[in-house]
A protein has these predicted regions:
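Short catalytic/ligand-binding loop motif for oxyanion handling, primarily in non-cytosolic enzymes
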Residues: 109, 147-149, 211-214, 269-271
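Bacterial N-terminal signal peptides that target proteins for export
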Residues: 6-27
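Aromatic-lined carbohydrate-recognition surfaces of secreted/lumenal glycan-active proteins
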Residues: 201-217
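A metal-dependent hydrolase metal-coordination microenvironment
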Residues: 51-202, 206, 232, 239, ...
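Charged catalytic cores and adjacent phosphate/nucleic-acid-binding surfaces used
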Residues: 41-70, 85-89, 151-158, 216-419
Length: 419
């Protein structure tokens, strides 16, 4: 049966949901009330309070590019999600995102009887209309949904989602989820990929390590995806989705020159799934773009200039992550304690990451170990004992909550000097 093969996230229990709701912050409540007062229930422009520092995802620009936080895998009631698209816009505004893509399943339509929509562009149109007047960019997209070998593939920057699905006969107008779905997946996945490619879509392989798709639970690229990657029809791969990170997917990205993608794949509320009111955050893709426009985001994605922010873990190629780390961590000052040769070095972290640092230099630190934390959006003073007063010091560090390969952490040299 179609629903048994195409399996999606299980619903939380009522008790779990009620427990989470008890802790929803005032800003989240204000968001929902604001939607009502702003005509949100008529699907008008979304309203969201100004994002707080505790919730907004913030990373500095690098010396060459703007750092944009985007979520390229989102669902609404127009497929198997449980909210209207304007709620997705409001959530993204609360999270301080720069762009989102509405990516409804084309074939899996559990709400079809209640929300029939022969035009599969409606989710994007609703979200784009809701975001008018804000600086949030809404991108068009769809999720091509099949069993292996294709699995699930997101196509972003499409012009017409209707051309990515082909249902023939009586099933075309059916509101029965199973009847429609079984008919929809008969159209070869490769033809859907070709249709998206003709529209200039950026395509990436979704949640490649799902155990119900690959029995080992380990990402293994198959002939279908390898061929499309070689032909320039597969451009990225999710290395993080919802609550998992797949190191094998990271290695696949490196081996096949695919963009690193991290997504929420949200179906319920962001507040339920990621608990931002308790310090959590949705997984996002950090795109290093020349400017904040849809065209620039598209260019950066095709150029593979991305990193992933997932559960306080930064994942990226060294060429992309290095400049971001250099922009995030800077030495503000250096001085010596009175009548000593103990240097105090003040390090500022302007990013959302709570960096777990390990000092790898030759000097002793005024700590119990060579490991220390550099908390997000704060300044930390580190004592260094060089043995004599030097005008300048270098602090080589390894950042253990970063990955530039599946087994390698990023390194950075902080340079301090007396003024």
């Amino acid at each position: 049966m179609f629903p048994a093969k195409i399996t999606f996230k299980a619903d939380k229990t009522l008790e779990q949901r009620m427990d989470v709701l008890k802790f929803v912050t005032l800003s989240s409540i204000t968001l929902l009330l604001g939607l009502q007062s702003a005509g949100g229930f008529a699907h008008d422009t979304a309203y969201a309070p100004t994002p707080s520092n505790q919730r907004a995802i913030e990373f500095p620009d690098t010396n060459k590019y703007k750092t944009l936080a985007i979520d390229l895998h989102i669902h609404s009631v127009f497929s198997d999600g449980h909210v209207w698209p304007n709620i997705r816009v409001a959530e993204a505004q609360q999270d301080g995102l720069d762009a989102i893509a509405m990516t409804e399943h084309l074939e899996w339509q559990p709400h079809l009887a209640d929300i029939p929509h022969p035009d599969r562009n409606r989710s994007y149109q609703e979200a784009a209309e809701s975001a008018k007047g804000s600086d949030l960019i809404v991108l068009s997209g769809s999720e091509i949904t099949r069993d292996l070998p294709a699995g699930h593939i997101n196509a972003i920057f499409i012009n017409d989602a209707n051309k990515l699905i082909n249902v023939e006969g009586a099933a075309k107008n059916s509101t029965d989820t199973e009847v429609f779905g079984k008919a929809a997946i008969k159209w070869p996945a490769q033809e859907a990929v070709e249709a998206a490619h003709k529209q200039g879509a950026f395509m990436f392989w979704n949640h490649p390590n799902w155990s119900n798709r690959e029995t080992s639970g380990i990402t293994k690229i198959n002939t279908f995806h390898a061929k499309n990657a070689a032909e320039g029809k597969l451009h990225g791969i999710e290395v993080a989705n919802t609550h998992w990170y797949a190191e094998a997917a990271f290695q696949t990205a490196l081996d096949y020159d695919l963009a690193l993608i991290g997504t929420s794949d949200v179906h319920d509320l962001i507040d339920w799934d990621y608990l931002p009111h308790e310090g959590g955050h949705r997984p996002v893709t950090l795109v290093f773009a020349k400017e904040k426009t849809a065209a620039s985001i598209k260019q950066a994605l095709f150029a593979r200039r991305t990193a992933v922010w997932f559960k306080n873990l930064l994942i990226g190629r060294e060429k992309d992550l290095g400049p971001l780390l250099a922009a995030s961590l800077k030495v503000k000052s250096m001085k010596y304690q009175t009548d000593t040769v103990i240097a105090e070095i003040e390090i500022e972290n302007t990013s959302d990451a709570n960096f777990d640092a390990r000092y790898t230099g030759p000097y002793s630190l005024g700590l119990s170990s060579d490991r220390f934390q550099l908390p997000a959006h704060s300044t930390t003073v580190i004592e260094v004992k060089p043995g004599k007063r030097l005008k300048a010091l270098e602090l080589p560090i390894t950042l253990e909550n970063t990955l530039v390969t599946p087994e390698t952490h990023a390194t950075l040299v902080l340079k301090a000097a007396l003024k």
